[in-house]
C-alpha cells in the first residue's frame, strides 16, 4: 500500500467515525448538562458532599469551586507521590522528590500531563491508578464544565450572572460522559493488545542474549482516558509509541479518534444548547479548516527527505514507529497538538524543521483545532467574541454575539483570556534562554545562528508553548529536570490553565446578566461562511502578530538553512 493511500484511508476512517457520532454524542452531552434529573449515584455523591444540586452559582462562586477543587487535587496528588513508598503496590519505588512531585501534581490537575520523569521507574501502580488516572477524569470534566458555563452565559437572560452549579457539571461530566466512553475505549484497546496489569514486570532475554526487565502497568484503563480527556501523560516513558500502549495501526486510529471525539462533538452541544445548530457547524468548520491546513503542511514536510539518512530512507523516518509510518505518525502529531493532549507516538524533536514548526504553530494558535476537552470550545468562543468586535469596528456598529452586547467589560475579559498564553510563552522563553545553566540542558547547541543553536532555541520555545497551553508534549532533546524548569514550567501550567478559566467565567457571568438584544439589519451574522472566514482570520492574525518574530528565530530559520 502506498503512503498516500494509507494516509487517505486513515484520514477517511477518522472523519467517517467522527461524522457518525457527531450528532448523537453532541446532543447527548447537551441533554446531560441541561437535564433536571439526577442519577442515583449522583444524588448519593451530592448528599455525601453536602451539595445542593438545584442551587445556582454566580461566576464568582463557580470560579471559587473550580479553584478550590483543583487546589485540593494538587495537594492530594502531591502527598500521594511523596508517600507512595510506604503504600501498597509500591513495587519498591521510593517517594517522589518534592520538585518532581509538585511539577507532576500541577501537570495532571491542569490537564497538561507534562512528564519530567520516567513513569516506569518513578510512579507506583497505586499512584498511577488512584492519583494520575483520577485527575485524568476530573481535570477533563473541569474543562467541559467551564465550556458549558460559558454557553449558559450566552443563553441565559438577566439571571444575575448565574452560570450553573460546578459540582453538578463536574459530576455529570465524569459519570455520564467520560466514564462510559473510557470504558468502551479501554475494551477496544485491550482487544488490540494494550496491557492491563498490576505486576511490577518480568525479565526476559534480549536480542543480545542479556537479561532484560520489562515494566508492566495498568495501561489500558489509563490509556483510554489519557486520550479521551485530552490529557496525554503516558504510563510508560515512550508514551503511545510503546507497543504496550499502542500496539497496532488500528489501536493508533482508535486513540486518534478518542482524542478528537469530545472536542468535535462539543460544537454540536454548543449549537444545541443555544438553539441554533448552524452556529456549532460554523465553529466546527473553522476548527476543521485549520486542522486540515496544519495536517497538509506537516504531511508534506515529513514525506520529503532532508539529510543523508532521510534521503536514503525516502522520508523523514527518524523517531517514527514503522508500524505507523509517516501517515499514522503525522495524523497523531497534528491531533495531539491541535488539542491539549500532548501524547506522542513519534519523537517530535526528530521531525523536519517545517514539520516540527507546524505542530508548534498548532499549539501557538491557542489549541482550538479542535482544542482540548472543553478548553478548545471556550477558547474559540472567546476568539469569536474578538472577531465580532473587529467586525463591529469595520461596519461601525455596536458588536453583538448571539443577542448579547459586547461592551467594554466583555471585550476586556476576552482580550485578557487570549493574552495569557502568549505572555507566558514569550516571557518564559526569554528568561530561560539567557540563563547560563540553560546551555547544559539543551540537546542541541552551538554558536549563534548555527543549526544546533537554532534548534536548541526551538526546544525551549516548544517547552513553554506546551506548558502554557496545557499540552504536555515536548522536544525530547531538552533536559527539564532542573529546579528552574520544574518550577517555571509548573507556574506556566498553573497560570495557563486557571487565568483563562477565571476570565472566561467572568465573561460568562457578565453575558448571563444581560438582556437579549433582538437582531437587526445591522447585526453581524455569526453563522455561515462569512463569519467562519472572519473568525479564521482573527485566529491567524492574533497568532501571527504575536509569535512570528520568535518563530523566525527558531523553526523558520532552521527550515531555511
UniProtKB/Swiss-Prot annotation:
It is found in: Cell membrane. One of its GO terms (cellular component) is plasma membrane. Its main location: membrane. The chain crosses the membrane at residues 5-25, 60-80, 86-106, 131-151, 177-197, 247-267, 281-301, 376-396, 415-435, 489-509, 531-551. Keywords: Cell membrane, Ion transport, Membrane, Potassium, Potassium transport, Transmembrane, Transmembrane helix, Transport. It is a multi-pass membrane protein. The system is composed of three essential subunits: KdpA, KdpB and KdpC. Belongs to the KdpA family. Part of the high-affinity ATP-driven potassium transport (or Kdp) system, which catalyzes the hydrolysis of ATP coupled with the electrogenic transport of potassium into the cytoplasm. This subunit binds the extracellular potassium ions and delivers the ions to the membrane domain of KdpB through an intramembrane tunnel. NCBIfam families: kdpA (TIGR00680). This is Potassium-transporting ATPase potassium-binding subunit. It comes from Nocardia farcinica (strain IFM 10152).
Amino acid at each position: 500500500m502506498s503512503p498516500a493511500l494509507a494516509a487517505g484511508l486513515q484520514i477517511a476512517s477518522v472523519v467517517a467515525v467522527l461524522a457518525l457520532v457527531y450528532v448523537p454524542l453532541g446532543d447527548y452531552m447537551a441533554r446531560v448538562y441541561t437535564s433536571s434529573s439526577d442519577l442515583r449515584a449522583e444524588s448519593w455523591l451530592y448528599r455525601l458532599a453536602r451539595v445542593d444540586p438545584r442551587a445556582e452559582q454566580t461566576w464568582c462562586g463557580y470560579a471559587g469551586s473550580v479553584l478550590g477543587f483543583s487546589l485540593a487535587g494538587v495537594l492530594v496528588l502531591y502527598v500521594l507521590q511523596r508517600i507512595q513508598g510506604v503504600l501498597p503496590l509500591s513495587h519498591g519505588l521510593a517517594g517522589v522528590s518534592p520538585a518532581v512531585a509538585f511539577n507532576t501534581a500541577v501537570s495532571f490537575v491542569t490537564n497538561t500531563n507534562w512528564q519530567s520523569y520516567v513513569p516506569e521507574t518513578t510512579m507506583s501502580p497505586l499512584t498511577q491508578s488512584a492519583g494520575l488516572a483520577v485527575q485524568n477524569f476530573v481535570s477533563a470534566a473541569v474543562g467541559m464544565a467551564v465550556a458549558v458555563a460559558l454557553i449558559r452565559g450566552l443563553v441565559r437572560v438577566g439571571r444575575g450572572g448565574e452560570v450553573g452549579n460546578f459540582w453538578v457539571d463536574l459530576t455529570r461530566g465524569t459519570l455520564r460522559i467520560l466514564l462510559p466512553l473510557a470504558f468502551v475505549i479501554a475494551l477496544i484497546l485491550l482487544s488490540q493488545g494494550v496491557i492491563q496489569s498490576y505486576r511490577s514486570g518480568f525479565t526476559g532475554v534480549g536480542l543480545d542474549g542479556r537479561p532484560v526487565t520489562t515494566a508492566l502497568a495498568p495501561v489500558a484503563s489509563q490509556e483510554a482516558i489519557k486520550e479521551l480527556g485530552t490529557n496525554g501523560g503516558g504510563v510508560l516513558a515512550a508514551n503511545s509509541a510503546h507497543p504496550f500502549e499502542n500496539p497496532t495501526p488500528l489501536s493508533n486510529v482508535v486513540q486518534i479518534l478518542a482524542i478528537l471525539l469530545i472536542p468535535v462533538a462539543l460544537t454540536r452541544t454548543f449549537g444545541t444548547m443555544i438553539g441554533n445548530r448552524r452556529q456549532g457547524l460554523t465553529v466546527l468548520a473553522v476548527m476543521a479548516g485549520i486542522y486540515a491546513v496544519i495536517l497538509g503542511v506537516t504531511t508534506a514536510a515529513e514525506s520529503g527527505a532532508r539529510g543523508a539518512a532521510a534521503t536514503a530512507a525516502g522520508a523523514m523516518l527518524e523517531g517514527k514507529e514503522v508500524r505507523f509510518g509517516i501517515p499514522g505518525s503525522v495524523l497523531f502529531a497534528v491531533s495531539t497538538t491541535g488539542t491539549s493532549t500532548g501524547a506522542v507516538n513519534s519523537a517530535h524533536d526528530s521531525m523536519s524543521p517545517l514539520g516540527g514548526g507546524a505542530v508548534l504553530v498548532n499549539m501557538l494558535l491557542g489549541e482550538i483545532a479542535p482544542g482540548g476537552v472543553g478548553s478548545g470550545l471556550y477558547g474559540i468562543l472567546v476568539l469569536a467574541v474578538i472577531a465580532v468586535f473587529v467586525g463591529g469596528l469595520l461596519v461601525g456598529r455596536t458588536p453583538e454575539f448571539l443577542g448579547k452586547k459586547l461592551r467594554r467589560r466583555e471585550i476586556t475579559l476576552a482580550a485578557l483570556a487570549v493574552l495569557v498564553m502568549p505572555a507566558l510563552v514569550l516571557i518564559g522563553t526569554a528568561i530561560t534562554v539567557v540563563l547560563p545553566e540553560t546551555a547544559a540542558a539543551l540537546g542541541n547547541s552551538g554558536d549563534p545562528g548555527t543549526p544546533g543553536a537554532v534548534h536548541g532555541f526551538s526546544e525551549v520555545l516548544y517547552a513553554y508553548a506546551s506548558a502554557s497551553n496545557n499540552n504536555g508534549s515536548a522536544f525530547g532533546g531538552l533536559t527539564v529536570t532542573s529546579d528552574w524548569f520544574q518550577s517555571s514550567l509548573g507556574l506556566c501550567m498553573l497560570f495557563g490553565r486557571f487565568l483563562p478559566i477565571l476570565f472566561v467565567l467572568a465573561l460568562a457571568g457578565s453575558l448571563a446578566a444581560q438582556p437579549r438584544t433582538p437582531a437587526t439589519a445591522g447585526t453581524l451574522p455569526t453563522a455561515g461562511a462569512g463569519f467562519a472566514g472572519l473568525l479564521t482570520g482573527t485566529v491567524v492574525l492574533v497568532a501571527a502578530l504575536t509569535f512570528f518574530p520568535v518563530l523566525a528565530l527558531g523553526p523558520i530559520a532552521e527550515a531555511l538553512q
